[in-house]
Amino acid sequence: MFLARNVSRVALRSASLSPAAIPQQQHAGVAAVYAVRFASSSGSGRPADNWAESQKEKAKAGLKDAQAEVGKVAREVKDKAAGGIEQAKDAVKQGANDLKRSGSRTFENAKDDIQAKAQHAKSDLKGAKHQAEGVVENVKEAAENAWEKTKDVAENLKDKVQSPGGLADKAANAWETVKDRAQDAASEVKHKAGDLKDKAQQVIHDATTQSGDNRKQDQQQRRDSQGSQSGQNSRSRN
């Protein structure tokens, strides 16, 4: 009787293991109940003890089956969890690679833009240089034109002095006229040369300033681009 009650308690405790083990647990519980009833109705108790022992073995077998089922379910859950973790790791790795590729494209685009602007600044400087050279050519041309005018005036004076009936006073007056015209021509050339020189210096100054500003802007953009790339790499590593 005491043994049958212990079997009943073991069977009832095993009923809380897992949903998958419910059929075996119910069978063990029912067997224990019948064992109690049979033991209480038996006079000698020995047949009841034998039957209770057999039911105890059946209950133990059912408990083992239930434990095996629980272990199987636990392993399946563990395998699924491990698979989920691997999928999550793969997703994070793929995302990091995508971010890295995107950051590389952004950096390359920024680098191309900086190179294009640098080339543009270089072209501007070349244009300013050509313009300054053009100013110098204009100065030379103006000086040559003035010199030609002076030569023409001198030749005219020579002709007048050597002409028949030419007088000393006329020659003197002509010479004064030539000198005045030569001085006027020289002053005009000097004035034009000064203006052109100022313009050339202004052009060179503007081009140099523009080139310096472009270099500063390009350097700042390069630093900004490198900082952005560094931040993206840091986030991808995290």
Curated annotation (Swiss-Prot):
GO biological process: response to desiccation
Subcellular location(s) of the protein: Mitochondrion
Residues covered by region (Disordered): 41-62, 182-238
Coiled-coil parts of chain: 50-202
Entry GO CC: mitochondrion
Keywords: Coiled coil, Mitochondrion, Repeat, Stress response
Compositional bias of kind Basic and acidic residues: 182-200, 213-225
LEA 11-mer repeat repeats by residue range: 64-74, 89-99, 140-150, 151-161, 179-189, 190-200
Bias (Low complexity): 226-238
Written domain comment of the UniProt record: Contiguous repeats of the 11-mer LEA motif is characteristic of group 3 LEA proteins and form an amphipathic helical structure under water-deficient conditions.
Family: Belongs to the LEA type 4 family.
Function: Mitochondrial heat soluble protein acting as a molecular shield in water-deficient condition.
Annotated protein name in UniProt: Group 3 late-embryogenesis abundant protein, mitochondrial
Native source organism of the sequence: Hypsibius exemplaris (Freshwater tardigrade)
